[in-house]
Amino acid sequence: MAPQSGPEARSGGADFVVVANRLPIDMVRRADGTTEFKRSPGGLVTALEPLLRRRHGAWIGWPGVPEDADDPNAATEPIEQDGMTLVPVRLSSEDVAEYYEGFSNATLWPLYHDVIVKPIYHREWWDRYVDVNRRFAEATAHTAAEGATVWVQDYQLQLVPKMLRMLRPDLTIGFFLHIPFPPVELFMQMPWRTEIIEGLLGADLVGFHLPGGAQNFLILARRLIGATTSRGNVGVRSRFGEVQFGFRTVKVGAFPISIDSAELDQHARSRATRQRAKEIRAELGNPRKILLGVDRLDYTKGIDVRLRAFSELLEEGRIDPEDTVLVQLATPSRERVESYVAMREDIERQVGHVNGEFGEVGHPVLHYLHRPIPREDLVAFFVAADVMLVTPLRDGMNLVAKEYVACRHDLGGALVLSEFTGAAAELRQAYLTNPHHIEGVKDAIEAALTQAPEEGRRRMRAMRRQVLAHDVDRWARSFLDALASKEPVEG
């Protein structure tokens, strides 16, 4: 069912609107039942805040807590925060279960990540996904000023561009996908494949991390809806593809996302961070080498791969448990989804096995924390670590790899990086590895641990040039310039 258009949709005053599943704040329930809002920092917020303030901008999203229809404390009114208007979209417990945990994270997420876990296709989840996307589109239509620019974010909202186009044809609409876009043969499994492609084609510009995702989308537009598309290769921030859809031309491009690298670089150089890094090394027993993994607890991240590789290197005597430790920081994630619960149990069994085999009383060889880590501690861990392990089976970009590089102004450290991350296309001087080949992962870890100091500095210097030059601000500018049909940022 299509959203209804009408003059009442044209009532907003925001010239620039960001639409995302989550608001850049978290709603917290107090003990007395009232609510407060806490800022939720992130790279996207950092990049877009100045623009939102300058252009009377609004951010539309869910505050993060399920709210049922009879909830007297429900967030329904716009919130003014730091010069931005935040517009909450209310989701009930059923919405969260079926739209978010269901269709978004048990259907789309595994399908888009190479079917590492089998996607589940429930019609009820799809119906809820359509309904929630419609609510986001309607909230946007009521918020955006005449002729405004709207930037829709990520896989949870792939139907919003078309719905919004029907409500507000005056708007300029961009869409960016923050996760990988799958190969054609995998996407074709989706029962609602045509609806998804048509939903995205409501945008004026559809953006992906890498040219490969853009090429896949162009093929699907031809195959599923018979659209005429450009045939040449899509470039990075240049050479856009095109889809002729009705009377409109939709641009398709690749825009690799990044981080606020200058801020991280500055943070890592501070006296407090350097002191905390020394304390971390001391708390770990001052080992000769520290390996580090930092991930959301997700089956795509390859945490089990690196634990197995580490265990086998210890078994084979290629790593000495007396002077090397692995620290795995795992942020809790999607704890009500069955596949995530099973994965956590498996990883924690592996941790117990490694420490049981190779640790000593008071000296575990593998330190595992399953909780959120404060930002200042995380930066100190990056500064302290000799080898960063980033081994996803599939990842749209992986910003942790870039964060580690941004924190290494000393040109120390080494990065072991999966070939199946978007970051691998940019950080070519990392120790690249195929996470499906355990011997290759072991060899990469060993090479990183034993690299000559000058070789390590050469690699880190080259990666830092890339990360510091291509920051999150440049990513946002390149996308929005392309959306406004200005000359794209090259390189």
From Swiss-Prot:
One Pfam family, short name: Glyco_transf_20
Chemical reaction(s) catalysed: ADP-alpha-D-glucose + D-glucose 6-phosphate = alpha,alpha-trehalose 6-phosphate + ADP + H(+); CDP-alpha-D-glucose + D-glucose 6-phosphate = alpha,alpha-trehalose 6-phosphate + CDP + H(+); GDP-alpha-D-glucose + D-glucose 6-phosphate = alpha,alpha-trehalose 6-phosphate + GDP + H(+); TDP-alpha-D-glucose + D-glucose 6-phosphate = 5-methyl-UDP + alpha,alpha-trehalose 6-phosphate + H(+)
Keywords: Glycosyltransferase, Transferase
InterPro entries in the record: Glyco_trans_20
The protein's Enzyme Commission number: 2.4.1.15, 2.4.1.347
GO BP: trehalose biosynthetic process
Gene Ontology MF term list: alpha,alpha-trehalose-phosphate synthase (GDP-forming) activity; alpha,alpha-trehalose-phosphate synthase (UDP-forming) activity; trehalose-phosphatase activity
Site (Involved in alpha anomer selectivity): W109, I179
Keyword Ribonucleoprotein recorded: no
Residues bound to UDP-alpha-D-glucose: G42, G43, R296, K301, L399, V400, A401, K402, E403
Pathway of action: Glycan biosynthesis; trehalose biosynthesis
GO cellular component, one term: cytosol
Domain of life: Bacteria
Keyword Lipid biosynthesis: no
UniProt: D-glucose 6-phosphate binding residues: R22, Y100, D154, R334
Family of the protein in this entry: Belongs to the glycosyltransferase 20 family.
Binding partners and assembly: Homotetramer.
Function: Probably involved in the osmoprotection via the biosynthesis of trehalose and in the production of glycogen and alpha-glucan via the TreS-Pep2 branch involved in the biosynthesis of maltose-1-phosphate (M1P). Catalyzes the transfer of glucose from UDP-glucose (UDP-Glc) to D-glucose 6-phosphate (Glc-6-P) to form trehalose-6-phosphate. Probably also able to use ADP-Glc, CDP-Glc, GDP-Glc and TDP-Glc as glucosyl donors.
UniProt name for this protein: Trehalose-6-phosphate synthase
Organism encoding this protein: Mycolicibacterium vanbaalenii (strain DSM 7251 / JCM 13017 / BCRC 16820 / KCTC 9966 / NRRL B-24157 / PYR-1)
